[in-house]
Amino acid sequence: FSVNGSTAALLAAVSASVNKGGKILVARNCHKAVYHALYLRELQPVYIYPHEDQRLGINGGISPERVERYLEENTDVQAFLLTSPTYDGVVSDIKTIAEVVHRHKIPLIVDEAHGAHLHYSKYFPVSAADLGADIVIQSFHKTLPSMTQTAVLHICSDMADVEKIKRFMGIYQTSSPSYILM
């Protein structure tokens, strides 16, 4: 659980997945907390841009083919992070993206802050936690009846270093959490 919202969970996920000074493939439309992690860990971002939906004037999803191309061109990338669903509700093909990312032996981190509700109806898209992502971050307060700042970091595979994540969650969260939020 995170009582410092998805921000602390994103900081911890990135910090635990990429060595200081390392490279990470990052969707350009990611949350500012990811940029804070890049700065704090002195990471080298490789930006991948979502396609633009001209008709709606919003960012679309990220294609698995584009992910494959970027990973082939950047073999020293240590993780891939994308946002799905986006702030506009666009969902990328997480299952196929996870297969691509895992062929390159790196973890897939999905910022699913706006998708905590996905588990609760067959009419919603499937959560990244069920589609092969290694780390999934959800903000309960964005789409569920929960207090502001409540979020979770799901560890979905052995590619996520649990001990590192625990250590960084301890660094990035308050040492005096509100029991009301927990």
List each language-model region with its residue ranges.
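Glycine-rich active-site/cofactor-binding loop and its immediate structural neighborhood
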Residues: F1
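Conserved PLP-enzyme active-site core in the AAT-like
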Residues: N4-M182
